[in-house]
Curated annotation (Swiss-Prot):
Active site residues of this protein: C51 (cysteine persulfide intermediate)
UniProt protein name: Cysteine desulfuration protein SufE
GO biological process: iron-sulfur cluster assembly; sulfur compound metabolic process
Species the sequence originates in: Escherichia coli O6:K15:H31 (strain 536 / UPEC)
Location, primary (coarse class): cytoplasm
Gene expressing this chain: sufE
Length: 138
């Protein structure tokens, strides 16, 4: 399983894409790089409401206080969007997550302007859920 890029490399890779179709394929590729989520993690408490597809995001805090995120979806593009979100929140504490605004990153990648309204709403639901869980831990 290939590793996910860091934030800066993610942005560079997005900017190298010639058109939205290439970005779409790259998002799907990122989703394919995510490790499989265990069946027991596909539970109601990890389910994200507000997404058209089934989405699960698991948040764990390691001994150093850093949040580790895992996620899965039954839709390839959504799984890729989960990967993008995981990359953006990588190596953050709960307070870092609460304070971090992902929107400028989405704007730099021209991500949300090419998503359908339902995908954009689902992406926002993921961000809200992650921030709420992080706030509860901080």
């Amino acid at each position: 399983m290939a590793l996910l890029p860091d934030k800066e490399k993610l942005l560079r890779n997005f900017l190298r894409c010639a058109n939205w179709e290439e970005k779409y394929l790259y998002i799907i590729e990122l989703g394919q790089r995510l490790p499989e989520l265990r069946d027991e993690d596909k539970s109601p408490q990890n389910s994200i409401q507000g997404c058209q597809s089934q989405v699960w995001i698991v948040m764990r805090q390691n001994a150093q206080g850093i949040i580790e995120l895992q996620g899965d979806s039954d839709a390839a593009i959504v799984k890729g969007l989960i990967a993008v979100v995981i990359i953006l929140y990588d190596q953050m504490t709960p307070q870092d997550i609460v304070n971090f605004d992902v929107r400028p990153w989405f704007e730099k990648m021209a991500l949300t302007q090419h998503l359908t309204p339902s995908r954009s709403q689902g992406l926002e639901a993921m961000i809200r859920a992650i921030r709420a869980k992080a706030a509860a831990l901080s």
